[in-house]
A protein has these predicted regions:
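Alpha-helical promoter-recognition and RNA polymerase-docking modules of transcription initiation factors
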Residues: 1-77
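Internal acidic/polar
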Residues: 80-88
Length: 88
């Protein structure tokens, strides 16, 4: 499987996950989508030698975790900023 094929398979999942976490953590879905696309590249660079089924399993897990971590980090950052402005 090539990187392009992996991306084409994963792009709809990335979009769904991005929209899901964007609603929960009040962040931009485009940013989350980009994080998911970068996760595909990183996954392929590291695990390209795996069989296709295994590569997809690993890819699903890594994409989900990367998007989740980014969304959670952004939410904390926004929460911290709003608390800082309230104290001023």
């Amino acid at each position: 499987m090539t990187l392009e094929e992996l991306y084409l398979i994963e792009k709809d999942r990335i979009k769904k996950i991005s929209l899901y976490y964007a609603r929960i953590y009040y962040t931009e879905p485009e940013d989350l989508y980009q994080e998911g696309a970068l996760a595909v590249i990183e996954t392929y660079a590291r695990y390209a030698e795996l069989p296709d089924e295994e590569l997809l399993k690993v890819s699903h897990r890594i994409i989900n975790r990367k998007i989740y971590k980014y969304a959670k980090k952004e939410y904390r950052h926004k929460e911290y900023e709003s608390n800082a402005t309230e104290k001023d």
